[in-house]
A protein has these predicted regions:
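A glycine/threonine-rich phosphate-anchoring loop and its flanking beta-alpha core
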Residues: 8, 12, 100, 104-192
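Glycine-rich beta-strand-to-loop/alpha-helix junction loops that act as flexible
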Residues: 58-59, 89-91, 227-228
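Non-catalytic interfacial helical region
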Residues: 70-89, 98-113
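Active-site segments that bind and position negatively charged phosphate/pyrophosphate groups
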Residues: 186-290
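Residue-level signal for inorganic ion chemistry
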Residues: 14, 31, 115, 153, ...
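C-terminal charged capping/lid subdomain of soluble metabolic enzymes
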Residues: 170-172, 269-329
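Short glycine/serine/threonine-rich phosphate/pyrophosphate-binding segments
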Residues: 93-100, 233-234
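ATP/NTP phosphate-donor binding region
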Residues: 1-85
Length: 329
């Protein structure tokens, strides 16, 4: 088992990491799950006496204020006080929404992240960003609040489909493209079935944690992590509006393809990245820019009435705050 020190909490990684689930000093414990993690993952946790289970429906379209009301109501009717803790057992939706509910319930109770998807392990559970979607726009309501701890156990990867693994792998690819050319070369030249997942999780978390610790509130270099996410969030919001939700990682991969075209890459580098993604991932159709524009102009990262991108200036390097008007895209 490995410990990575984040800003104010520890990230535990390994097959024995669940032994670090410490709830001894809390008055009450709730475990937030969806129908999938209740079925596949809940039994893998150590037994917690006198805990309650809060089950919510799965899916990005359920990451909204209505589901939060359900969570808050369960906490309230069970008389949870400020010395209680919420354990978020699930993917990015559970972690984002559960963290938001905990941080706002009675002005804040502790929460522990136990991510069960690759995407949540390498990205969503790290860094203290929590929130929900609003008015059809991705992550419009939220705040920064760190968990008490993050517990990452590769055993949960066995519960995932190949599509879910590939969705999480999108964030791994992003981390390599923005910071580490050597890591990108290893990933892009290794067969998916031959990947060492624990090693990949370890490296990816270290990349994100280093960036976040230096800029926890995303005032400067943390914006590097937004590569692929301006177009990516617009694509994800578009498919949600069409009632054809896609995985977050799928939208990020399509965002990477589009944002590479805006980046200061050589043509060979653009072709290398695009060909790798198209060859190795079965992606939905990329919507036209006209269909994405209303989502782009409402992106929370925008500045000066312009659309804000993080872009590559080479594989392993990126620049932040690249501003474009609608006409320039």
């Amino acid at each position: 088992m490995k410990e990575i020190k984040a800003d104010s909490y520890s990230i535990w990684i390994g097959e024995t990491s669940l032994s670090k689930l410490d709830i001894t000093n809390y008055s009450m414990v709730a475990i937030l799950v969806d129908e999938n993690t209740k079925r596949e993952c809940l039994s893998l946790l150590p037994k917690i006496n006198n805990s309650i289970i809060i089950e919510v429906p799965s899916g990005e379209e359920k990451k909204n204020i209505s589901t939060c009301n359900t969570i808050w109501e369960k906490l309230s009717i069970n008389n949870f006080d400020r010395n209680s803790v919420l354990i978020n057992l699930g993917g990015g939706v559970i972690g984002d929404m559960g963290g938001f509910c905990a941080a706002s319930y009675k002005r804040g109770i502790d929460f522990i992240q136990i991510p069960t998807t690759l995407l949540a392990m390498v990205d969503a559970s790290i860094g203290g960003k929590i929130g929900i979607n609003f008015n059809g726009l991705k992550n419009q309501i939220g705040l920064f609040s760190n968990p008490k701890s993050v517990i990452i156990n590769p055993i949960f990867l066995k519960t995932l489909s190949r599509n879910q693994l590939q969705s999480g792998f999108a964030e791994v690819i992003k981390h390599s493209l923005i910071t580490n050319k050597k890591h990108w070369e290893i990933l892009s030249n290794t067969s998916f079935k031959d990947l060492d997942w624990q090693h990949i999780i370890d490296i990816s978390i270290q990349i994100k944690n280093t960036i976040v610790k230096a800029d926890p509130l995303e005032k400067n270099n943390r914006k590097k992590l937004n590569f692929g996410h301006t177009y990516g969030h617009a694509i994800e919001s578009y498919y949600l509006e069409e009632k054809k939700p896609i995985l977050h990682g799928e939208s990020v991969l399509m965002g990477i393809i589009l944002e590479c075209e805006l980046s200061l890459l050589s043509q060979n580098e653009k072709t290398e990245i695009k060909n790798y993604l198209i060859k190795n991932f079965q992606l939905p159709d990329i919507p036209s820019k006209n269909k994405l524009m209303k989502f782009l102009i409402n992106d929370k990262k925008n500045k000066e009435a312009k659309i804000n991108f993080t872009l590559l200036n080479g594989i392993g390097n990126c620049t932040i705050d690249n501003l474009f008007t609608e006409d320039e895209l």
